[in-house]
Amino acid sequence: MTAIDVSVFAQSQDPDFTPALVGKPWDPKRNAMVFDAMGEIRDSFTDELIEEILASGLRAISVTCGNPRQQNQSVEQNYQSALEEMLWFDNYIEEKPQYYIKATSTADIDRARKEGKIAIFYLTQNSEHFMHDLDNVNAFYGVGQRTCQLTYNYQNMAGSGCMERHGSGITDFGGLLIEKLNDIGMMIDVSHANVRTALDAIEISKQPIQISHTTCDALFSSPRGMPDAVFRSLADNGGVVGITQMRLYITLERYGAVDLYFDHLMHAINVAGIEHVGIGSDRDHRRLVVTPEYLEEMQQEQGERFDISKVPLYFEELNSPRRMEVIWDKLLERGLSEDDVEKVTGLNFCRHYNNLIG
């Protein structure tokens, strides 16, 4: 990897930096519901970090299994990648029973809240791992998958992603897949889909669907954002939209722009309604420092898609395992009641999961 001057990221260099917005410690007596509908858990997390994440109130998270970048893989590779990662998470959770619970229903969230642990749900950010065989939906359900994102960034057999130049909507196979997912009780996610695919899926599905991690195209134009029409249609059909914490889909400003993130949350609430908005961070919960090692990690993960101009990917004020406390306090400042804040931080997605998977 070519050497990169990291001094341009000076605000991210102090590993002991504490975001100024982090206020009082989370009150465990409040026991508010905190659910990250699309986040990351890594084996590099130390016990100390996990305990800090727990102290922030997080009690449920959905994690991506497999490599969703299907254009670089065969469907067989997608199948193997998704299966191997689900089995890896099985082992990882078993090795840390003091912190984690493998989750397949909201009863596992209830248990996590009672025991002070994190319930981990499995999702895929693509449907290619089914290898165009609907019987494989049953197989992955049996392993523990509870959410399927229909597409990633490009065209697949189900529909079209947001980066496809001449994309379709839901395909004939995609319609059959939606029907199968409805029947078996696996949730449908249209994050990364193009607008037509998202609207088609909402119309075809007999069950509410979700957009676990997106932004508001009305505030900042990005391929990963969704227009208000999608939010309204989703809400009208009982779904939930999660707003991502990925800065590059919200602003080009590297620092000092965290209020724009809360603008997106409030806009989604105003359009879809307070019952239909949640959090899907699309990030892990580490405190990140931009170093050559971190940049190399990003380059390995993203390959040719890696763009140094987009670093840092996060808002510095949310760059902490205590970020959910920041979100709680800032939404109160925006005028929401504590009851409504809890809907956004977790209850809405918890209700959605309960309605669809029990």
Predicted regions and their residues:
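Divalent metal-binding pocket/active-site signature
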Residues: 128-131, 140-225
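N-terminal hydrophobic targeting/anchoring segments and the immediately downstream early-domain regions
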Residues: 2-166, 221-358
